[in-house]
């Protein structure tokens, strides 16, 4: 695991962009993408670059179940706004949150991932160490699955909605095993609220109670965090 400590999230986004650019130069064709505030500086750099993604495939980690893609809180909407409107990909896969049969959609998404092995997976991390909607206790062997959102996640996400009742209770999420099958993983973490999660990710035991801790067992992981998020790390892990 490589740790890169930056002064802020803007520099962190640039470091992640450099990894993607190098990967594309080396022939990478499939990017695993995340939503949330952490990857926005990366997507800004991608949009501002002269890179052409029209021959690339993207696969997103997750989507709320029950939200129309046009809803401004859907992850479809997020990706269009922050990346795809300016930089279209050849194929852009995101779970269908309006699928009539959620189990069929889970199977369909697993097939998509199997047919398009991910070269570089971008991740964020939650305060409790979750990655995507894989909350503490999610089996490390999980593939794409439907998720009942925890009360803490519903409360955390309620700030994006008019009230807590509007927050979806279910999501479709790429599983931890699927994430671990990516050739390279780049995890982004910025701000004081991520200090404990970063420390557990890097230093703690590998346990399903901290889903991100499994990344210690991946052969090619880069953690990019700002100085604040890295504040609790043992100095030996900082470069």
UniProtKB/Swiss-Prot annotation:
Record key words, sorted: Carbohydrate metabolism, Hydrolase
Pathway: Amino-sugar metabolism; N-acetylneuraminate degradation; D-fructose 6-phosphate from N-acetylneuraminate: step 5/5
Enzyme Commission identifier(s): 3.5.99.6
Catalytic activity: alpha-D-glucosamine 6-phosphate + H2O = beta-D-fructose 6-phosphate + NH4(+)
GO BP annotation list: carbohydrate metabolic process; glucosamine catabolic process; N-acetylglucosamine catabolic process; N-acetylneuraminate catabolic process
Catalytic machinery residues: 62, 128, 130, 135
Claim: DNA damage is one of the keywords in the record: no
Matching CDD domains: GlcN6P_deaminase
GO molecular function, one term: glucosamine-6-phosphate deaminase activity
Any one cellular-component term (Gene Ontology): cytoplasm
InterPro entries: Glc/Gal-6P_isomerase, Glucosamine6P_isomerase, Glucosamine6P_isomerase_CS, NagB/RpiA_transferase-like
Similarity comment: family membership: Belongs to the glucosamine/galactosamine-6-phosphate isomerase family. NagB subfamily.
Job of this protein: Catalyzes the reversible isomerization-deamination of glucosamine 6-phosphate (GlcN6P) to form fructose 6-phosphate (Fru6P) and ammonium ion.
PANTHER family xref list: GLUCOSAMINE-6-PHOSPHATE ISOMERASE
Protein name as it appears in the record: Glucosamine-6-phosphate deaminase
Source organism of this protein record: Lactobacillus johnsonii (strain CNCM I-12250 / La1 / NCC 533)
Source organism phylogeny: Bacteria, Bacillati, Bacillota, Bacilli, Lactobacillales
């Amino acid at each position: 695991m490589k740790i890169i400590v930056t002064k802020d999230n803007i520099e962190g986004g640039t470091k992640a962009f450099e990894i993607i650019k190098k990967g594309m130069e080396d022939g990478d064709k499939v990017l695993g993408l995340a939503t949330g505030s952490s990857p926005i500086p990366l997507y800004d750099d991608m949009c501002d670059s002269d890179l052409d993604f029209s021959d690339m495939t993207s696969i997103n980690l997750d989507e709320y179940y029950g939200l129309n893609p046009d809803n401004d809180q859907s992850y479809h909407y997020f990706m269009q706004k922050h990346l795809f409107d300016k930089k279209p990909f050849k194929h852009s896969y995101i779970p269908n949150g309006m699928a009539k049969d959620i189990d069929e959609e889970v199977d369909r998404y697993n097939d998509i991932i199997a047919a398009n092995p991910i070269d570089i997976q971008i991740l964020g991390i939650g305060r409790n160490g979750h990655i995507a909607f894989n909350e503490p206790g999610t089996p490390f062997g999980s593939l794409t699955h439907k998720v009942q959102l925890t009360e803490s996640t519903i409360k955390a996400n309620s700030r994006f909605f008019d009230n807590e009742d509007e927050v979806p209770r279910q999501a479709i999420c790429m599983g931890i095993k699927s994430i671990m099958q990516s050739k390279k993983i780049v995890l982004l973490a910025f701000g004081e609220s991520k200090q404990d999660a970063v420390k557990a990710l890097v230093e703690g035991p590998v346990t399903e109670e901290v889903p991100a801790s499994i990344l210690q067992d991946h052969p090619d992981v880069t953690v990019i965090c700002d100085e604040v998020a890295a504040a609790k790390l043992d100095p030996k892990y900082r470069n």
